[in-house]
Amino acid sequence: MMEGQQHGEQLKRGLKNRHIQLIALGGAIGTGLFLGSASVIQSAGPGIILGYAIAGFIAFLIMRQLGEMVVEEPVAGSFSHFAYKYWGSFAGFASGWNYWVLYVLVAMAELTAVGKYIQFWYPEIPTWVSAAVFFVVINAINLTNVKVFGEMEFWFAIIKVIAVVAMIIFGGWLLFSGNGGPQATVSNLWDQGGFLPHGFTGLVMMMAIIMFSFGGLELVGITAAEADNPEQSIPKATNQVIYRILIFYIGSLAVLLSLMPWTRVTADTSPFVLIFHELGDTFVANALNIVVLTAALSVYNSCVYCNSRMLFGLAQQGNAPKALASVDKRGVPVNTILVSALVTALCVLINYLAPESAFGLLMALVVSALVINWAMISLAHMKFRRAKQEQGVVTRFPALLYPLGNWICLLFMAAVLVIMLMTPGMAISVYLIPVWLIVLGIGYLFKEKTAKAVKAH
């Protein structure tokens, strides 16, 4: 245990293996896949499949690096614990708070999406009203106990998975039975101007948006402290990520782009709506809206869980106020859930004041925070592995391609930042990174000063 972990109580280990597996899976199927893929298809054409394969490989390397650390030391606060222990107290402080802010931003974005999806049925309801209602409901559920969160996420994820699998099967049937019409042919993947119609540039420029789709995979690391059997469930969930990326992202996009020429995809429609259009309008439109609504709620649900656990871990390390390191008699960190909720509620206000511009900026900020997050996992892992080697410890679940894999990941992160600088509307979030790091530095110095003052008394 780290120093500063004596106070506060323990989180309950209430998550079963099936919960962990589906939390990992659900984290990867969100708004990014359902809606974000349209603009990528317009720019990269069928090359989007290659883009998801590359980003998926990087995500898998990062997951394995996190997995190796978590199996050795399953604690609350996930990788901020490793950054803190193996890299230094500022790294722990910065990575923990960055992760917390990342998921507050994702929570804001998903709540905004929920408001938009509800308007599909009830256009007269303003987005902030639906956002506020679901905000209250999901926070209330998370305040009960971790088993309820696990169950809810389990069923949310099942709905999303069934929808994607049904789409792949139905699309495959249309393709191979001839019922998809004359335009449905596998040759659509290379006939319309080639596999990479706009060359590699078209694909490379979209890597930041593709990366947004993979944010959330690292949720598995956060669940470790509440998993019944982390040394079995974490490696299993981590290794299955690769099949899931292949099936859900690459499989669904390959079917989708074979069914009709990619040139017919429009940026403002979910490509998944287009494919199911064949079934008849109203049924499909409603069914799909339920699925995308579930996807957004599921990711928001995970955000509430994640934020509260990260803040709890920070408080245990002494990097957040002590009051946040307590749990109630059911093992729920009530204070951290309420603090995270309070900050997220602020974004309901932002959406109320500036509904148009808020969403795009939130997305770009999410990718920037995600880049910092993944880079820190990779760097902390290198420090962790070095420390273990010096102690002569052989880890039970070693990461792939160490240390080359870590350098590949870091190069990829740097490339994503360069791409964002060249993308209109995204550059601002890259310029905000140094500002954010300065804010973290000031926060850290304030914390150190306060700690010294307390010790002096």
Swiss-Prot record:
Primary localization: membrane
Pfam families: AA_permease
Compartments where located: Cell inner membrane
Catalysis performed (reactions): L-phenylalanine(in) + H(+)(in) = L-phenylalanine(out) + H(+)(out); L-tryptophan(in) + H(+)(in) = L-tryptophan(out) + H(+)(out); L-tyrosine(in) + H(+)(in) = L-tyrosine(out) + H(+)(out)
Induction comment from the UniProt entry of this chain: Contains three promoters, P1, P2 and P3. Repressed by the regulatory protein TyrR, which binds to TyrR boxes. In the absence of TyrR, the RNA polymerase (RNAP) has a higher affinity for P1 than for P2 and P3 and occupies the P1 promoter region. When TyrR and its cofactors are present, TyrR inhibits the binding of RNA polymerase to the P1 promoter by recruiting RNA polymerase to the P3 promoter. P1 is not repressed by TyrR alone but is repressed in the presence of phenylalanine, tyrosine or tryptophan.
GO biological processes: phenylalanine transport; tryptophan transport; tyrosine transport
Site feature Key residue for tryptophan transport, where: 103
Record-linked InterPro entries: AA-permease/SLC12A_dom, Amino_acid_permease_CS
Protein name: Aromatic amino acid transport protein AroP
Species name: Escherichia coli (strain K12)
Higher taxonomy: Bacteria, Pseudomonadati, Pseudomonadota, Gammaproteobacteria, Enterobacterales
Name of encoding gene: aroP
